Amino acid sequence: GSGGASSTATAVLEAHGANVVVLSRTGKDNYQNLNRHSDAALIVNATPVGMYPNVEASPIEDLAAFPMLEGVLDLVYNPARTSILLKAEALGIPCVNGLRMLVAQAKESAEWFTGEPIDDSCIEMIYSRLRRQMENIILIGMPGCGKTTVGTSLAKILSRPLKDADAEL
């Protein structure tokens, strides 16, 4: 993408010495000629492609076409594991979503609006809390094996609602 998130990612990567190529729908570097950049070491998705509710969409269909790829950063944070991140995981490529960046941006915005400093340690604390809230535990097993019992206990321990398929159906 070539919007604001892309500009931020580009600035940070270039500050760390990266040679950045920005792809967008139009221009000489676009989604139709991704193969020209098969030597990419890092892919950053700075588009809403893959964001809820269009979770099946992916900005790149075949990550294997990038044999030098060392990491994928998807700035989408909902869902926590987008289609492109799942593809990266399947290939053993380190990957991360944009939730931590969102929290860091919120911290900076809050400081700007309030004029009060906020300790950087709050970023990790809030990120961890949000990540836990976004994750689910799914229990799968044969009838009578204890899924409901274990699920009920986990729901109490984690202070989370229990969605029992037997009760829902």
Task: Label every PLM stretch briefly.
Residues V150:
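Hydrophobic positions on the alpha1 helix immediately C-terminal to the Walker A/P-loop
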Residues R160-L169:
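Short beta-strand-centered segment that lines the nucleotide-binding/catalytic pocket of NTP-utilizing
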Residues L23-K28, D166:
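N-terminal Rossmann-fold cofactor-binding loop
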Residues G1-E14, G141-P143:
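Glycine-rich adenosine-cofactor-binding loop
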